[in-house]
A protein has these predicted regions:
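Zinc-dependent metallopeptidase catalytic helix centered on the HExxH motif
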Residues: 252-338
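Extended, low-hydrophobicity, Ser/Thr/Pro/Gly-biased non-transmembrane segments
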Residues: 3-5, 9-10, 21-28, 37-39, ...
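Ligand-binding face of N-terminal immunoglobulin V-set domains in extracellular IgSF glycoproteins
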Residues: 34
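Active-site-proximal alpha-helical
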Residues: 24, 215, 293, 298, ...
Length: 554
């Protein structure tokens, strides 16, 4: 690497309430051109004595100096899918490394076995002096050198990933040590956390400890491979009254948490899984397509399976059941894959060519965990639900290969499985999950999913429309009962009907609607044409009125 020591000096910005001023200094630069990755920084007011220009992802600098200096400001607190991305206040500061740090591209893409021959320091001293100087103001940061300074010497790619993904959190916290064997787990919670009281605090501590112990066992952590973890439970944002996501790294997780919400337990479990996987499997290869879908699929699979370790009373109160969560995911998968095949028949091993954020979200958090579940059930004669992760751990010193993984797990079935589900669009056959599906909740569950999909796609598709499933009522049910409607073919129709009457009803209603409006099921714009196009809306409404009035069949 053609760089010397790197230092970030972080201060409070004078321009906006939740902005930070960053001064980056890189010593002994031996390059004439420097390329810094902007990533998720909301950057503005860049100052540099060297010539530079920017595009959407990078800052390009024509460097002439031995010691390079760049000053810039970043905005903290943008709203995302899990809440507000950080917060800056007097009692709490929390944000993710990648929200404030600009690093050279060569560092972020270096090989797993390389180490930087320099130090990387982040100094928050001035920031804390500007906002709060009380003695009991805690700092929870990675690579902690002192209270308000982070310093990593000889960083590997895994260390840089931790620096970028981790939370940097400061504030007033209570602290509990959950575990000391094979590494320490520290739990911090905001003193002003409205979700905690003296009644449920002990229950919270016991159950978070149970999840951590589950992952210590799963990843085979022992005295030769110790693992530390800091979990910070934040209060809600005072300004927006929304959740705060501070960051999620290898050793430090920070987010708002309500122990009475199942989704919060799932997200915490998901983040703890990533923490352990990043600790044990340090290679960059697991974070790149076409392998990333497997990593996220495992995280979503285990976010639910690990919750089986919670206390019985808490699981009953929050309706936490692993197979039921898999059934909900499978229902979502069937619904969207069959409703919009041109959008959602996504091939996992083509992950690297997918440009749509919404499609990636669907692959990672709906389809991928089902593929993991399917794989674990194919050869599950001995009841082992962990064959994939055990293979990865046992072969962590070897170069990772999807082909080797699947041949090891499936043997002679591998080629057939790969052609159908990894390189093809065959429907994943998990029909037995119907046993765990509550049919009366299907429409409500899918209505929630329609909203989630809308949040995924609206940023890239201005005309993406959320389908209001409340409009599919008894009138349409009467029309469906008069017709023999196939969901693509007779076999699939029978499977769907047996799996869920409500799912079958919704899919058949969509098929009737597309037929009436003469829109192909393969049309890439089918959602807009059926739900927004004024001519088709009129045709559909007239059809409903006429069908009920005359009881005619179409």
């Amino acid at each position: 690497m053609e760089y010397g020591d790197i230092k970030f000096l972080v201060r409070k910005s004078l321009n906006k309430e939740e902005s930070l001023n960053i001064r980056l200094k890189i010593k002994d630069v031996n390059l004439r051109e420097i390329q810094l990755y902007k990533g998720k920084t909301k950057i503005k007011n860049i100052k540099c004595k060297e010539d530079f220009y920017c595009d959407s992802n990078f800052i390009y600098i024509k460097n002439k100096s031995r010691d390079f200096i760049l000053e810039y400001e970043v905005l903290i607190g943008s709203l995302g899918k899990h809440g507000k991305g950080g917060e800056i206040g007097e009692d709490l500061i929390s944000f993710m490394g990648e929200q404030i740090l600009l690093l050279p591209v060569e560092m972020l893409t270096m090989s797993d076995d390389l180490k930087l021959n320099c130090s990387l320091e982040i100094d928050f001293t001035k920031l804390i002096e500007d906002l709060n100087s009380e003695d009991d103001y805690k700092s929870i940061i990675p690579f902690k050198e002192n209270d308000f300074k982070s310093k990593c010497i000889g960083a590997t790619w895994s260390d840089l990933y931790e620096i970028m993904k981790s939370s940097y959190t400061f504030g007033f916290f209570e602290e509990v040590v959950l575990k000391k064997e094979y590494g320490e787990v520290h739990l911090y919670y905001s003193i002003e956390n409205e979700f905690l009281n003296t009644i449920n605090k002990e229950e919270l501590i016991r159950n978070i400890k149970s999840i951590c112990e589950y992952y210590y066992d799963l990843f085979k952590i022992d005295f030769l491979n110790k693992k530390d973890l800091n979990i910070v439970l934040l209060r809600k944002s005072k300004n927006e009254n929304s959740y705060i996501l501070g960051g999620s790294g290898k050793n430090l997780i920070s987010a708002t948490f309500d122990m009475n919400k199942k989704r919060d337990w799932q997200l915490l479990s998901h983040r703890i899984f990533h923490s352990f996987m990043d600790h044990v499997l340090k290679s960059r290869v697991y974070h790149l397509p076409p392998n990333l879908w497997l990593t996220e699929g495992l995280a979503t699979y285990y976010e639910n399976l690990a919750l089986e370790s919670l206390e019985k009373e808490l699981k009953e109160r929050l309706d936490i059941k692993f197979k039921k969560e898999m059934a909900i995911l499978y229902t979502r998968y069937l619904y969207m894959t069959l409703k919009e095949p041109s959008r959602f028949k996504i091939i996992p091993m083509e992950e690297g060519s997918i440009r749509s954020h919404g499609k990636i979200e669907f692959l990672h958090y709906t389809k991928a965990p089902l593929l993991v579940y399917f794989l674990e059930t194919l050869n599950n004669s001995c009841g082992n639900k962990n064959e994939i992760i055990e293979y990865l751990i046992n072969n962590k010193e070897k170069s990772f290969s999807m082909q080797n993984l699947f041949y090891n797990l499936l043997g002679f079935q591998c080629d057939s499985f790969a052609s159908k589900y990894l390189f093809g669009n065959s429907i994943i056959p998990l029909w037995d999950l119907k046993e765990y599906l509550d049919n009366k909740d299907v429409i409500c569950t899918l209505k929630e999913y329609e909203y989630i999909l809308w949040t995924w796609f609206i940023g890239e598709e201005e005309n993406y429309i959320e389908d209001d499933l409340r409009e599919y009522n008894k009138k349409i049910e009467e029309i469906i009962s008069c017709r023999n409607i196939n969901i693509y073919n007779a076999y699939l129709t029978k499977q769907i009907e047996d799996y869920s009457k409500e799912l079958s009803f919704l899919l058949k209603a969509w098929i009737i609607r597309s037929n009436v409006c003469n829109v192909s099921s393969q049309d890439e714009n089918i959602r807009y044409k059926l739900l927004k196009d004024k001519v088709n809306l009129r045709i559909w409404n007239e059809f409903l009125e006429q069908s009920i009035k005359n009881k005619v069949n179409i």
